Amino acid sequence: MTPSLVFLIVVIVVVEGQGWRPWDRFNHPGNFGNWGGNNWGTRQRNQEPHDIPPPVPPPGFRGNNDRFGGNIIKVVEIIDLGKSKNRGDILSDFKDVHKKHRHLGRKEWKGKVKQFCHRFPGHPNCRRGKVPDQKELEEMIGQFSKGGIGRFLKRVPKIYIEDPLARVDPKLKGFLENAGRGFGHVSSEHVNKLRDICKRRKCREQPESAKKTRELFTQKLADFETKIAGKDKTDSVQLRFDRTLQIKEALLEKGNLTADIVPVDNGVYDLDTMLTEEQANILLNELNKAGVGDDEIPLPDADTDDEDDDDSTNSASGAAPGSSRLKKSALYFEGNLIKKWDPSSPIRYVLDSSLEDLDKNDVRAAIYEIEKNTCIRFKELSSPPTGSHIVYYKVDSPTFCGLSYVGRADPANPVYLSFGCDNNKGVAIHETMHALGVAHQHLRNDRDQFITINWSNIDPQQYDAFVVVDSKLYTSYGVKYAYDSIMHYNGYTAAQNIAIPTMNPKTNSAVNLKVLGQRQKMGTTDIELLKKMYCQPGCDDKNVYCGAWALKDLCKNPGHDQYMAANCKKSCGLCAIGK
């Protein structure tokens, strides 16, 4: 057996918490995802009925078919990323040059240094107004071992985030238990449990799989955006992934865990989502990182007609490229962090040629389910249009189920699916709902009322998978927490010991633990949320906390009903009923 195939078999158990259910090996033999138990390697289509069938069967619908066997070689090829194109990772290039004791010619060295200092303008060796000498290479690389990538990156723009409670009755504030904690709050008890874990395992070593994942999706995203923009977008993608790492580091810093844990640097946030630069900048502002980093100092004798005009230099604050001053702009809680699609026209989407017929059927079935239950409409196109749209890609990899942005992204939304997980239609629904702007259920601000996080069993390097969303930036719209939400992860997500849950339901735990992470169909609350987001035009909440107040039954509370009726129509269910 080849080393690559051995790795393939071993890595199956670490897929993130969507459709893979590793605990089935202990509780339900024979149903380990689609690849385990008695049917390993066999795709049983008749075990995946469409629970809410579309009015007309999706084009290309077929019955049983084995997809795994035909893709095994592709999977191994994806794993062996050492042979793939290392697109734009100048830091890896420098490490390779140093490791092999290569001496670069003057022109080649200048070109690489320019690329390095464009990506890391805050690096000390890029702040001297001259081209660093190649003899400084070891020093340049060594700076990164000290941690804190944010100090090397372009300055985080200052963004004014309005306090939604500034002009609210103090009595209403009393109903918000966690409002004052801020994004990234973690108790000292939980911090100590994470530290205890790191006494027994290595928490400061970057997993090799993380590097490969980042390389893979840097290439995928850069290819996707370059094709649309007509110019190389690698720098823009690298900055977004660097910002994602910066957020993970800032979250650990807030918990005083920097000395104990190095977060996974794979470009992915919360296991299956990507951040736009705008979203990353907003979250960094919430973590008090506004102004961290520096502005680029042009190197002498360097070309000036480069790609600095790409969107990697544009910030959520509206700062002009190259601006050395921090500018401000207001953040409206329902508008900026998550961009929604225009509900008055169909969302255009394309099924990339990388999808097989059965893969396309799964995506179409997912879209049919959303259409059947809501007012949202989609339109399939044969080729990418101009303007906003979704493109579904297949990435043959056993290490993930799906990956997407949360909300509409510019220039378009790529959705990456492996089609190797339990119930691929459900995974496609999950990722499409991310694209529509829906965050994970288990990261809601009220999640601790419904589930208990087992901090003694989570992977500390994937700490971001358990950080609740910022209460000032997300709203529930008054939709209740649901264990059967298709946006919930399974109870064993990011577990060290996959036989022990990382999330336990507080209600009817034995039954609901099996429900967590279901991908059979949209839950009733998923449908309700999408309807409130897209099917009630002209009716909005005026405060991001309306959802939380509605869940406290304040819509009919005699002391607050007038305020709620005037300011929280959507969360109180006072809008015209959409489909």
UniProtKB/Swiss-Prot annotation:
Binds 1 zinc ion per subunit. SUPFAM superfamilies: Metalloproteases ('zincins'), catalytic domain (SSF55486). It holds the Pfam family Astacin. Gene3D superfamilies: 1.10.10.1940, Collagenase (Catalytic Domain) (3.40.390.10). Zn(2+) binds at residues 430, 434, 440. Residues 35-58, 293-323 are annotated as: Disordered. Residues 293-312 have a biased composition (Acidic residues). It is found in: Secreted. Its EC number is 3.4.24.-. Residues 329-536 form the Peptidase M12A domain. Residues 539-575 form the ShKT domain. Disruption phenotype: Defects lead to retarded growth. Its cofactor is Zn(2+). Residues 18-328 form a propeptide. SMART domains: ShKT, ZnMc. InterPro entries: Astacin-like_dom, MetalloPept_cat_dom_sf, Peptidase_M12A, Peptidase_M12A_astacin-9/10/11, Peptidase_Metallo, ShKT_dom. It is an enzyme of class 3 (hydrolase). Keywords: Cleavage on pair of basic residues, Disulfide bond, Glycoprotein, Hydrolase, Metal-binding, Metalloprotease, Protease, Secreted, Signal, Zinc, Zymogen. Disulfide bonds join 375-535, 401-421, 539-575, 546-568, 555-572. Its main location: secreted. Expressed in the anterior part of the intestine, CEP neurons and to a lesser extent in hypodermis. Glycans are attached at residues 256, 454. The keyword Glycoprotein applies. GO terms for biological process: proteolysis. Metalloprotease. This is Zinc metalloproteinase nas-11. It comes from Caenorhabditis elegans. The gene is nas-11.
